[in-house]
């Protein structure tokens, strides 16, 4: 990310930074906008069973998406609404269902509505899913299983507040 910010092409891009929050995860979001397609990097704490008190420590998850601007509407001179969707990849160290913590890796996808204001502020509401594998320990052995939470928790909405530089 540092190389992208200091390169000539990186400086020509619009950069957006913000906070993302949901019942499933909370973290930071970095978005690089160039033309019609954007890229997004998320670094989040996975909050599975943290909010309900069953787990005291969150997991960590990093996701990268290519965002395609599918539609855009102008509400007035100050506000635009964009619909974005796209594929990506995710990796981290999280819990899956009632299993212990383990490494997760997989393909991911996202869709969101972005409310963009001329002041540089934007508010996004969307969803993301992960189709991947999870490693865990069962009876002292390491197992590789389908990552259930990536699909089960895809319906949980995510809200983010961002500032454009």
List the predicted regions and their residue ranges.
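Acidic-residue sensor for enzyme active/binding pockets
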Residues: 16, 40, 158
């Amino acid at each position: 990310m540092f190389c992208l910010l200091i390169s000539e092409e990186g400086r020509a891009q619009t950069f957006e930074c913000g906070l993302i929050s949901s019942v499933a995860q909370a973290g930071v979001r970095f978005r690089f906008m160039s033309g019609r397609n954007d890229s997004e990097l998320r670094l989040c704490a996975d909050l599975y069973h943290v909010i309900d008190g069953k787990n005291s420590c969150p997991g960590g998850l990093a996701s990268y998406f290519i965002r395609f601007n599918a539609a855009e509407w102008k509400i007035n001179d100050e506000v635009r609404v964009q619909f974005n969707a796209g594929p990506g990849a995710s990796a981290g160290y999280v819990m899956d269902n009632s299993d212990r913590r383990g490494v997760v890796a997989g393909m991911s996808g996202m869709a969101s509505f972005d409310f963009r204001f001329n002041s540089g502020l934007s508010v996004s509401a969307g969803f993301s899913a992960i189709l991947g594998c999870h490693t865990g320990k069962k009876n002292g052995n390491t197992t590789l299983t389908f990552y259930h939470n990536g699909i089960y928790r895809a319906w949980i909405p995510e809200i983010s507040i961002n500032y454009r530089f």
